[in-house]
Design a protein with these regions (language model features):
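Short cysteine clusters
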Residues: 110
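Cell wall/extracellular polymer interaction/catalysis modules
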Residues: 1-107, 118-143
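A conserved hydrophobic position in a structured secondary element of the catalytic/binding core
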Residues: 113
Length: 143
């Protein structure tokens, strides 16, 4: 469906996979950039913030923003042990869409897969990787 801030739906369309991030200091990639999460790492999800839908290092961010390190702990809070950013630009189109580690809960619009599958995917993705999210084969012609 159509994604917007708070909709908990994965955006339909074609999205560039811009960079990966996670708990470890580094990850095996095929050219895709990787960032290590630290205590100051936030994904800005407040649509009124001028840095909306971006990774920022801050001393503090309001509760509308996602403190990434909170999701690198032991299961089930381990989604961001390893993740890949799906670029979804536009104000109020939803924010923080990632391909990340699967746990016991449904996502809030992200795509979740097993940890080893995230690692394998990341090891094969380059800088020009995209993800296509459609409901059926016929919709592919729209992209």
């Amino acid at each position: 469906g159509n994604s917007h801030e708070g909709s908990s739906t994965t955006p339909k369309g074609v999205y560039h996979l811009s960079f990966a991030f996670g708990k470890a200091a580094s990850a095996r990639t095929s050219g895709m950039a990787y960032r290590q999460i630290n205590r100051k790492s936030y994904w800005i999800e407040d649509p009124h913030d001028r840095q909306y839908n971006t990774w920022q290092n801050r001393n503090w961010a309001n509760n509308k923003n996602e403190h990434l390190i909170d999701y690198t702990k032991a299961a089930p809070h381990n989604q961001y042990q390893l993740a890949i950013v799906m670029d979804n630009h536009g104000q109020h189109n939803g924010s923080g869409f990632f391909i990340h580690v699967k746990n016991q809960w449904a996502t809030a619009g992200c795509v979740s897969i097993n940890y080893n599958d995230v690692r394998t995917l990341l090891s094969r993705l380059g800088t020009k990787a995209y993800v296509v999210d459609v409901q059926n084969r016929a919709q592919l012609q729209n992209y």
